[in-house]
Amino acid sequence: MVRLLGYAPAIVAQPGERNVSLRRSANRAGTGILVALVVATTHPAAAQITFGSPADPPRIAIGGGAFDVLPNSGRQGNGATGLALGEYRFGDVLWIVAPFVGAFGTGKGAFYGYGGFGFDINFFERFVVTPTAAVGYFTHGTGVDLGAHTEFRTGAELDYRFENPSRLGVGFYHMSNAGIGQHNPGVELVTIVLTMPFH
């Protein structure tokens, strides 16, 4: 929308335009990670690409972040809110596949308990990208109603691995009911997570 203030036009972004901008930024970030992985994969000697982390023990993960980071003004209860999470990560169990269980709660009273699996893509010695998929039970509290109690979460985490081998990383995820509910708005999550060996 354009408003005239004196003789100078001022462009005022509408809520929908801001959401489109946020989604474009998120898409660019995801594209950047994908391009980096493709480049690393096509130059494996330089990037030292390996799959799985068989030497790593089971780990406890704790962290926080934001839930519903790309809000839609048409949804009741929408809007970004903080979250706190905890996970137990079993380590590589079947080839490079590592299962996990976890839960998070949000500042609006939402709760999600879930289980899933992921696999590590190690590159440049200390960096790890872990794509994951999970399914679990969700209650929305006073936040956005995702349309069903059964919700699926997909995404990836980018970590720096320390020598001990704890990790510190950031994750970006999408949650939705995959169409099993009457409506399926979906949300995005951003997390910062510290994982520590659990012996």
Where are the predicted features?
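Repeated loop/turn-to-beta-strand initiation elements of outer-membrane beta-barrel proteins
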Residues: 60, 92-97, 125-129, 164-170
